Amino acid sequence: MCSQIAIELNDTGVTVRDEFQLLLESPGYIIDCSGQEWIGKEARDRAQLFPNECNNRFWFELAQSQANAVNQSNAKLVLRHLASVWQQVSSNATSVILTVPATFTKTGLGVLLGICKQLAIPVRAMIHHAVLVPRQSDYTGLTIHLDMQLHQTAITLLQERNDEFSVSTVELLDDIGFASIYTTAAEYIAQVFISATRLDPMHDAELEQQLFNSLPVWLEQAQSQGAVQCRLQYQNNTYEAIVDAHGLIAGLKLKLNKIINILLSFDSKQAAIACVPEMIDKQLGFSSYANKHGIMVRRLGLGYHAQQSFLHAKQVISNDAQVYLIKQLPCATLTDPLPRLTNNSLATSHQQATHVLYNHRAYPIEDILYLVEIIGVELQLQNHQSSEAQNALLVIRKKSSQLLIEITNGNCIKVNDQEIKSYAQVFIGDCIRVNDYEEQLMLIKVEQ
């Protein structure tokens, strides 16, 4: 009996479906350590234990391949990952639809198809993720596809014409993905553990692995709870820290704001629906950020693009040896109600920060905190009056229920990439950059 499957690719990993169910999810991780190999979930769950032997960038780098500059080691890792996936799902599969993100270059797609041919994967069609999103019935605004992956985010504006979706504009953010988001969240939680227990989870491989394995659950809990109870096991002891959900979520605000700014840049005067991975909403509360700016959000579940590809199978399947990327398809119309606009996320609550996070150390603000520049030490935070404090670059001061940042001596100070001329009110999650320093300071809340 012949069967058809769809393989959904991005640099987070590989998802495989048939027409009726999810068959496999394999994260884009490989560990090769002294002859021992782990691929997919087994590798991801050991990534912090073997940081030098773990690779999770091969899909990302293959996707960005340029002509005459294909990294063969990345291609070999993609081949090994796909071979592992194909071995598990190939039984009776005689036809495969690939769905791919906007991040793939033509060269990257060519290498990918060559790898599929080498593995005897019978690819019959290849579809751009964005054109698989649903069209909302009786809706005339913008439809935007947001594809957050492990190391990057692709944002695609769709054009609708004659009941078809086609790719109009693509914006790429190579510095925002789940990897950078998890790292930011892990550093915040680690600082809370240090303050509460003196245990630094980032300085022990097994502890760090525990932390990263727990992050998705803790981030989800932070969307509905005021505080998250985090536990780690170390040397037969249990260490516990209560993490303020507001601070944890707000610490990711700068990254989400970059995404929102791109969504608004398309046409802020029109209504917009953003179709996003369910994970970005469940773990980061993306809907509340988007809703605050009038953008509705449609959540796409795991393997959504693979599932939707079956609606177009008869139209796109080709017996021709040549397979081309399909970037235009008839719209699949939804009759569900429009997504609702809400604005009740914990992340939007303005709470007062208690500490400044700088170089992995949390400095208490108390009543006043001076940022000074010391030759040989670079930046230093002080909460007492000193000779250096008289020439402070900036001052963070509590004033009744507000937390204010005051600029001194004509320094260039930016809060969330916006230059501050004299003073400004600041909140949990705000990021401060000073003059030409690469390091940033982040306002956080640490439970006492």
Model-predicted segments: where are they?
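Conserved phosphate-binding loops in N-terminal lobes of ATP-dependent enzymes
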Residues: 12-99, 226, 230
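Phosphate/pyrophosphate-binding loops at sites that engage ATP/ADP/AMP, CoA/4′-phosphopantetheine
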Residues: 83-96, 195-204, 256-273
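Phosphate-binding glycine-rich/basic clefts of nucleotide- and phosphate-handling proteins
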Residues: 159-245, 275-280
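Active-site neighborhood for divalent-cation/phosphate handling
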Residues: 75-140, 154, 160-162
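Gly/Thr-rich phosphate-binding beta-strand-loop-beta motif of the actin/hexokinase/Hsp70
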Residues: 1-33, 136-168, 185, 215-231
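Structural motif
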Residues: 8-11, 99-103, 147-149, 275-281, ...
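Forkhead-associated
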Residues: 354-448
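Helical "lid/coupling" subdomains associated with nucleotide-phosphate turnover
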Residues: 220-345, 349-351, 367-371, 376, ...
